[in-house]
Structure formats: C-alpha cells, structure tokens
C-alpha cells in the first residue's frame, strides 16, 4: 500500500533553495509515486507563490510571513527573518491540521535545527507515525546547540524521538549519537547531477566564459561557489591571493552577510584587480564557469558535507579544502591520507599560507593534477550520483521504516 510522508523543510522550490531543498527534490523525483506520496510544509516567504502547489512528486503547503517577490537578502531582514522562529510552532499546527485529512504514515524532517522541533512535537502528538530526521547541518554542532537552547528539551527530542536518523557524513552521525539517538545513524551522502557537471563544453563556450571573467592567457583562476558566511572562510582565500603571484585570481560566486567585510579586506590587501565578487550564479550555467577556471577552493571552518566540492570534482577541477566535518569523508590528501587514493589538496582551517602552498603545488605538478582529478571524478560517479542516492534512501531508510506497518 502507498505510504504518505509529510516533509518538514524551512524552504522549498521554486525560490530560496539550498542544498537541503535540492536533496529533497532530487530524491522525491526519483521515487515512484505509486509507492510513496509526499507532502511538504515550508515557509512561503513570497506572497506571489500559491499556498498549495504540486512540484514534481511533492505537494507543497506554504505557511508564514510574506512580502512581494523578496530576494535572498530580504530573508535575513524583518519581517521575513521571523519565519525561522515562527516555523517551529506554525509548522506543527499546519502538520496537525493536514494529518486530520491525509493520515500520514511518516514524517521526514530536513535538518534538526531547522525543523526538528516541529517534527519532534508531531511525533509526541502522534507516536504511531514514523519519524525520519535527516542531518545536513553545516554549522558546528556546539553553535547549533547554543542557538537552540531556548527550545529546551524539545530540541533534544528532535533526535531522541526519531525512529531513523539519516546523515550525510560520518561527522554528523557522531553528533546524532551525542544528542541521544540510540540507533545506528544511516550514512547516505548528498549527491550531484553528475551528467550536468561532467558535460563537455566547446572551446568557444569556455572562451566566452573566460572573457566574461576577464581571464587572460597565463592567468590561473581559483573559483568558489559559496555563501559568503564565516564558516566558508572566503576571507582566508582572499588573504592567500595576496601571497600568490600576480597572475593568480579568485572568482567568487555567491552572496551573503560577509560581502561588506570581504570588500574591505580586498581593498586593504591591495588585490582589487585579482579578486572578483561575481554574485549569484545560476545552477544551469555553473559547470561552464567552473570549467573555465582552474582550481576550486573552499577552506571551510565547518561543513556538514558540501555539495560544491563534489560538483567541482565531477567537473574535473582540482579541489582545495579543509577536512572539517563531512569533507573528510571524500577529500583525501596525498600527505594526510596516504592509505587512500588522493582526491584533493587538504589544508588546515584558518591557514592562508597552506592555501598558497597548495595552489603552488597544483600549478607546478600537472601530472599529479591529472591523476587526482581523474580519481576524484571516478569516485563521484561511483558514489555520489542522485540515482544511486535516491535508491539508497528508498531501500535503507523508507522501506525499513515501514516494514512492520
């Protein structure tokens, strides 16, 4: 018999999405609607969006405060910024109302800090409904726990009431155990659209992207696709640029609260002609611009997993990163991980000097770069494809969850 699952997510398509929302859509699009019926409760944010809408295999129910056609930046301002707080109660009541007519077999919460509170409350109210929690958090656990302290034990119940916890990294699995989950977390990482990021581009297309970037012959372009926030350490790359030869540039695709700080730092270090803040990039054209550059970098101070790294590996770019959090599951360094096939260049957090050393190594060892990028792409194709991940979610999470019902 078909099972009905209600998903809790702060946001959803078509606007204001991140890696968590991408994961929901990629997974649900690949699961047969004959086996599972998905509903989702999220914030509406934009008054032009309908309150109820079917997107792919998901029926979306929107709640919360709205303004007309807000930007991502508007979501961090009043009144929309209040939605993160009010969702903790409104989502529970919306789910409760929906349950009276839909009679859900299970609920699925996307990230503990975002939706674990309403999902845990729903499980307390309806103990017969199965509950899956997915951990995709990128911030340090201690920061999240401090932030959620006002919710008291209800935040802890996001973990302890879960029938299954699925995590995207070993690091997050350890956090689930520390928070009181008594089962064994199911480790299923996020994935990427491998066909999208491995697609070939003509030299004409790549030259067009290079021209737009202002890339000249002999230039080496580092690139990142990252929110401009503290954890992503874009500032460390800017500091590293000042230590590198004048032909090394840094293309930054992303927006966020750190932008003003970065603009000041770029001026202070005298690298205004070599660091390019390019704003948002559409996912549809991202592979073209990645391949027009030479090195992907994000020296994260914390990371749940990081889809951007895997996307860059699929595009056959050499990757420089830390091994913080979930990155350690897939980025293996020649020196730090001699027992693993090398898939990237690992640096310590907060170390512009190590970043500069890694960039110089990549620029002077083309044979190593070819070997590493080939190895990394093969790993991504074998382990991080959405078809594989969706199949694993069905066989390792949903089917066992409902086996006895």
PLM region descriptions:
Residues 280-281, 288-293:
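Short alpha-helical donor nucleotide-sugar binding micro-motif in glycosyltransferases
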Residues 171, 191:
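Carbohydrate-associated surface elements
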Residues 301:
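Aromatic "clamp/platform" in nucleotide-sugar-dependent glycosyltransferases that forms part
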Residues 330-352, 361-366:
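Conserved acidic donor-binding segment of nucleotide-sugar-dependent glycosyltransferases
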Residues 6, 166, 216-232, 238-241:
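Conserved donor-binding/catalytic core segment of Leloir-type glycosyltransferases
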Residues 318-321, 326-331:
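Short hydrophobic beta-strand element within catalytic cores of glycosyltransferases
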Residues 113, 125, 131-148, 164:
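A short, histidine- and acid-enriched strand-loop-helix "catalytic/donor-clamping" loop
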Residues 361, 368-382:
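A short, well-ordered alpha-helix in the C-terminal region of glycosyltransferases
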